[in-house]
Each structure stands twice: as C-alpha cells, then as structure tokens.
Amino acid sequence: RELLIDFMNAENIPYRIEGKIVVDNDIEKIAELNKRAEDLNMSGVKALERNEILDLEPNCKFKSALYVPQAGVVDYKVVTEAIAKKFVSLGGTVEYFQKIKNINSQNDLKVLTSDKESFSSEYLINCAGLFSDTVAILDNINPNLRIIPFRGEYYVLSKQKSHLVNNMIYPISDPNLPFLGIHLTKNVDGQIEAGPNAVLAFAKEG
C-alpha cells in the first residue's frame, strides 16, 4: 500500500484517501468486524454510532458503522498505464493483442508461445485476471478452482446528486456470497457510482 502511494505521488497520479464506512443496523455485526480489525492491528479503524456516522455522511441513516481511514480511491487505469510506462522506461517490453497458447519450461526458463511469437523469461507472473486459471493450467499448475465470470453493472448519479455522498459507503458483505454488495463510491473526479449488481456472463470476454 505505501509503495503504491509513493508511486502515485512520484507519477503525479491523482487519488484520494479519505476513508470509508461499512454500515449495518446490527450493532453486534459492526462490533464483530471491529474486533477483526483490532486483531489485524489496523490502525485508526473504529466503530461509529449514529451521530458519528452523520458527521461523515449526513445522508446515511444507519445505526452503526465501521470507519476505515486507510481506504481511498484512484483511477486504476491511470495507475496501470503509468506502471507500463515505467516498465518500458526501465528496458521492459509490453506486447499487446497476443493470446498465450502454450507454456513450457526449458533450461530454467519459462517459454511462452502466443498466436504470434514466443517469449522466454526466468520468471512468469500470472496476473491474467479472469484468465488466470487458464494461464495456470497452461503452466501445468492445477489451481483447484475455476473462475466463473460475472459482470458488474453500476449506476452513475447525476452531478446534481453528487453532494449526497462524501466518500465511500459499503454494506457488510455476506460471507456466504462472493460479492461485496451494493456500495456507493465517490471517484477522484467527484462522480458517484452505485453498484455493482452481479450478472452471470456467458464468456470471460463479457
């Protein structure tokens, strides 16, 4: 986290760290979440009562909440573009529009064959997102799981309503479901997003 903040400062990437609140009307659930934060030594995290919630989010009508001051927002597309630019400046190469077809190990190197050419490297970092399970299998690794693609859809509040939310408001997620739940986020540009829902996608591409 601190390294990312240092990088964003060095690259003049706009971001905001003004915290978020996790809300619920069940005070015991908030207390349990607060206990977990204490066990993990998360500094500054604290349970809020109704009046304290209203100080942060005047339009939030929940009875209890957990305040997480470390939370922030950034346009991560801008971050990844800056990382790619830095990578190239240090001698790296970014290849686009290639699909990896095969991965082999040869003389302590990973050899990746795409639909256009082959690459070799001492290290392979799998950060293929929705396709990370596919890449793992190509590398003869059984991840013992499969990624099922879901599409999340968001509503964007009109500019006239942007004053309704100051930062981020999240529900307590259901541990029986693999979703964060519908939340409200004020982005770095001041735009408010509400969502996401979860729509089963029939393909990883969308």
PLM ranges: what are they?
Residues 19, 49, 69-70, 96, ...:
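A secondary-structure boundary/capping signal
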Residues 103-206:
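Flavin-dependent oxidoreductases
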Residues 66-123, 127, 131-134:
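Helical element adjacent to the flavin cofactor pocket in flavoenzyme catalytic cores
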Residues 3, 35, 82, 134, ...:
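Alpha-helical scaffold segments in soluble metabolic enzymes
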Residues 1-56, 62, 181-182, 190-191, ...:
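Dinucleotide-binding Rossmann-like beta1-alpha1 core, especially the glycine-rich loop
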Residues 20-22, 65-67, 154:
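Short aromatic/hydrophobic contact patches that present stacked aromatics
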Residues 46-49, 94-96, 126, 194:
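General beta-strand structural signal in soluble alpha/beta enzymes
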